[in-house]
Amino acid sequence: MKPAILVPVDNTPVSKEVLRFADDWAARVSARLVVLHCRSAAIQDLIERGELQNPEPSFEAHLQALQLRSEVEIVHLFADPADGILKLQDELEPELTIMAAHSHTLAGRLFLGSNTDMVLHQGSTPIFVYKQTQRDPQQVVVPLDLSSISESLLRKADELALARQGKLHLLHVLDYPEIHVVGGGAFYGVAIDGGFLQERREQLLEHGRKSLEELVAQVELKSPYQLHLDFGTPYLQALQLAERVNAGLMVIGAHDHTALGRLLMGSNTDYLVHNYEGSLYVHQELQS
């Protein structure tokens, strides 16, 4: 059986776009689509009492009208969206979950709302957060913290960039150098040598660049790429870089089952998911 791509949808216009996007993805990787449509127990009660028409036939007709190329399985669940997604992730073990987000008019507000946060933190698959955007889909920003997940994250980013004939922008954000002052006391003040600080920053940048170059050499990237190093807050630097290069995709990482749902940049990743104007691929190493 072909591997599955899970696609939760609702009744918003963006769902049509995300289904076509997921269809292209499935065709490229020879996967099948599992389209999930959830409805609450209250809605189901109205249907059973005859006060509301069963939406399943019209939903399936709408899906058929899209003329998707991939093999499609439709799953209707009586559940909250997040619970339904997590349930199917456990049952099907899909290789990817593709979820939609609204356009820039509601940037960062995912169509499942807080349920999406729950899926991001408790889910067991990589997640692609699709957003309607005017940004360049061929420019791909990849924040890297050089942790254990960075190699597999970079390989996935390279694969995604190749599929869209894109360019990778590899970002490593450094902490500002620490200054330890001994003696003198705060009353008198202490003069810090600006030349020393500049030298220390240059040393940290050089060390970070070498580490990033070693990672790139190990992965043997096939896509064109550019290295970016800076000091500051990771999510702010990532957003600023994405703005400068007009990036339509950002690839970020999540740890494996040893810290399930804890994204490598912690709250930084939550901020990016809700504030970045392009699509995001949240990478997670799957268990064999």
Which ranges hold each PLM region?
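Alpha-helix-centered segments that form part of catalytic cores
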Residues: L205-A217
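A short acidic, glycine-rich active-site loop
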Residues: Q53-P57, A191-H207
